Amino acid sequence: VILDPTLVRDINMENIGDLLRYAISQSPKVRGIHFQPAGYFGRIPGKPAGNDRITLDELIYETERQSDGIVKAEELLPSCCDHPLCGFHGDFVADNGRLFPLLKQDNKVNICGSDSSAADKNRAFVAKRWLRPYKKTGSQQCGCGDIHNMDYFLDKVSTHGFTITSMLFQDAGTMDFSRLRRCSLHVYDNGKLIPFCAYYLSAWEQ
């Protein structure tokens, strides 16, 4: 299970911390939370006000502030396969209501190359982090309860992996072709793969 709350300014932006703590409390049934800022495409009738949109840096700041230190801003990194302005992700182990980060900023790793597409890499991440692993028997489990013990830690990575992610959709007022070219989320239509934001792009009444 991945929780996927849509965030709307003046509606639930102050509930980010509560949503995160609830998701952690439900681990390992809940494998992560995806914060989705409301998009202004599709059937949106008009252009949003200037402060309606939620930015990624604002969302990262609020996640750190409202989590009371459970998550730090530097633990939420740009996607290594999409454009860095399109989203972020954090990879953690959940243990006793706390999150232990598995990622750190490193300019030499996690760079998308030509060996596989961005979509392939994202599918591999989902398979690795969001699918439930096989259940070990009692004799195979480490019961020490110490996250610093290697066997216990490796068990927890498999069974209590937890992700925090977000994706910022584009609309008619924010469309950026450099972001669109690196899209990994597509709609298949009439034999073509069309970037998600472009497929649902709608004009606004002036």
State the predicted function of each range.
Residues K72-C80, C86-H89, Q170-A172:
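Glycine-rich, charged/polar anion/phosphate-binding loops
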Residues V1-D52, L56-L77, C81, L99, ...:
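Conserved C-terminal portion of the radical SAM core fold
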Residues D82-L85, F177-R179:
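A short catalytic or substrate-binding loop motif that flags glycine-/basic-rich loops and adjacent residues
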Residues G90-Q206:
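Radical SAM enzyme core and accessory elements
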